[in-house]
């Protein structure tokens, strides 16, 4: 599915470079293929939880005064990326690795490996 200016269409070659292209991913199949290839599944979570775990709110707080235009733009972007009704719950993050020790920051809380 593709989006251009908030309108859905099915041709990814229409307006190249300007479309947002969305794919529905079978993360269980990806995790299984990674495991079969000798990779470890390090974590699986929502985009929102991943960004919160990685400190997106701390980054936002460093943007400057909350009334500044830059802060307001950044806050809107964080809202769009993390809100459950926006991209926060719909988009997911899966990490595969080989030989990596220890937990990854992005999966410190809210890991959903059990859901795969």
Task: Describe the role of every protein-language-model region.
Residues 1-116:
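Long, Lys/Arg- and hydrophobic-enriched amphipathic alpha-helices
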């Amino acid at each position: 599915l593709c989006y251009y200016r908030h309108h859905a269409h099915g041709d990814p070659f229409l307006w190249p470079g300007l479309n947002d292209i969305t794919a529905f991913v079978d993360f269980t199949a990806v995790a299984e293929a990674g495991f079969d290839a000798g990779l470890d599944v390090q974590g699986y979570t929502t985009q929102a939880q991943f960004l919160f775990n990685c400190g997106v709110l701390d980054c936002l707080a460093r943007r400057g005064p909350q009334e500044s235009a830059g802060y307001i733009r950044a806050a809107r972007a964080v809202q769009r990326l993390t809100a459950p009704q926006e991209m926060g719950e719909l988009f997911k993050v899966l990490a595969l690795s080989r030989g990596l020790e220890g937990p990854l920051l992005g999966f410190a809380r809210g890991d959903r490996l059990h859901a795969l």
